[in-house]
Amino acid sequence: MSVQLDPSALQKMAEVAAAAEQQSNEPMTVDEEYELWKSNVPMLYDFVSETRLTWPTLTVEWLPQKNLVAARTRQQLILGTHTSGEEQNYLKIGAVDLPVEVTENSKKDREIDEEDEDMVLSNVKIVKKFPHDGEITRARYMPQDDNIIATINGEGKIFIYDRSKNGVEALLSTLEYHTENGYGLAFNANEKYSLLSGSDDSNIALWDISNFEKNIKPTITFEDAHTDIINDVKWHSSEAHIFGSVSEDSTMKLFDKRSSQIIHNINTKKPYNTLAFSPFSSNLFAAAGTDNLVYLYDIRDVSNPLYAMTGHEDAVTAIEFDPNNDGILYSSGSDRRTIVWDLQEIGAEQTQDEIEDGPPEVLMIHAGHKTSINDIAVNPNINWLVASAEEDNIVQIWKCSSNIPRIGGEPEVDLSILD
């Protein structure tokens, strides 16, 4: 079967779904939507892998190295477990062996049969795991040394691991300050050993983990930084002293750690769940949450968002800028969707048919999950490769089709139309 992306593929999928609903006079079930998505995989993707884990993971992040193993590219991911107290929890390192062509952005057709193992069965395998105190709500590696991984659990305790070690030696430090569950955890890409955390206790803490002492206390704390649960914290991508937070109190705040002051206090109509700073523009950042919209902001004037992007049908749970492609943003949500946004297309003119398909900035909608998506990660080494983790133990790894012009380059001209 030749892998060709019909320019109207998304419209065709919508038409098929609409026809199925009209025929049954009832909305499609989640399983029916999944089967429809699966039938369109060869048309919409260069690669898809789905792995069912023993327990759900609330977190996923690609590790930066890649290795060539038996003519396949091996990439590793950070995963966690959430066993609800039924079994021991673990920090896990997963590995996936990708077909070499997945690392290329080739538009060449290739033959894929329905049982193509390269495309479908490159499952994530757990290659290393470390016992962990409680469920892992977030895990992130330190950019300056990817052997160092920080985790935070349901009690707000933070742990520092060295994944190059084994057994009890791998746990280097325990960081105690927060008193409740935490989802905010971020290393500073511009300052080694600098860690940021936020939790349900409404507090934010900054940590220096350089000594790897058994027990570490925060260097700076922001007591009652918010008046409700903190959903996320992130460092600015290029300014080492600036970070942001979002909260259930319907505020988003930007801080300067040099003065321990809030530099922007932004009131939002609904609580935001997540935020992200652009790696290409020092002024651009994004945030999203419970009103299903993805907002773009200019840090120089935060009085109003630059733009609000529509596409999700439920709360947005995670957003991430593409580290390889300027203007590309990913968002995932409780609607079981990950949307790939092309910010360069905002405001582009559309035909009536295109308007019915959705906003011009929607480049791709990944619709392969059956439950809410907990976290997403964009691969820093392989263009357009994404990992997404859902509530129902599933991790999917996928790469949009290189036949999509923005992904594979300018479309080739079909000279036959001139005959």
From Swiss-Prot:
Q: Which keywords does this Swiss-Prot/TrEMBL entry list?
A: Chromatin regulator, Cytoplasm, Nucleus, Repeat, WD repeat
- Each WD repeat occupies one of these ranges, namely 131-171, 177-217, 225-265, 267-307, 311-351, 368-408
Q: Which Pfam families match?
A: CAF1C_H4-bd (PF12265), WD40 (PF00400)
GO cellular component annotations of the record: chromosome, telomeric region; cytoplasm; histone acetyltransferase complex; nucleus
The compartments listed are: Cytoplasm; Nucleus
- Region listing for Interaction with the histone H4 N-terminus, in residue ranges: 353-357
- Answer whether the UniProt record assigns the keyword 4Fe-4S to this protein: no
Q: Which InterPro entries match?
A: Histone-bd_RBBP4-like_N, WD40/YVTN_repeat-like_dom_sf, WD40_repeat_CS, WD40_repeat_dom_sf, WD40_rpt, WD_repeat_RBAP46/RBAP48/MSI1
* Molecular function GO labels: histone acetyltransferase activity; histone binding
Record site feature (Important for interaction with HAT1), residues: 284
User: Which superkingdom?
Assistant: Eukaryota
PANTHER family tied to this protein: WD40 REPEAT FAMILY
- Can you tell me which family this protein belongs to? Belongs to the WD repeat RBAP46/RBAP48/MSI1 family.
Query: What does the UniProt record say this protein does?
Result: Regulatory subunit of the histone acetylase B (HAT-B) complex. The complex acetylates Lys-12 of histone H4 which is required for telomeric silencing.
Subunit info? Component of the HAT-B complex composed of at least HAT1 and HAT2. The HAT-B complex binds to histone H4 tail.
Task: Give the protein's recorded name.
Answer: Histone acetyltransferase type B subunit 2
The gene is HAT2
